[in-house]
Amino acid sequence: MQVGEKVWFLYVVRCSDNTLYTGVTTNPDRRLREHNKGRRGAKYTQARRPIDDMVLLDWFVGRSRAQKAEYKF
């Protein structure tokens, strides 16, 4: 890991309509709050609140690697 690189988490949440949403974040707690309340939540989850559970699937050094894993999921 190089100096300055962040750890990114790949996560999945279950929405109120029982669908799944995957994403990446550097701060899982903040991201769950954003999905439930904030304007920064994904458009997909804004219409499917509340989001109760978040499962962290893996972690990566660098956003690009995390997004590649998200795409494969």
Language model feature labels by segment:
Residues 1-40, 47-71:
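GIY-YIG nuclease catalytic motif and its immediate N-terminal context
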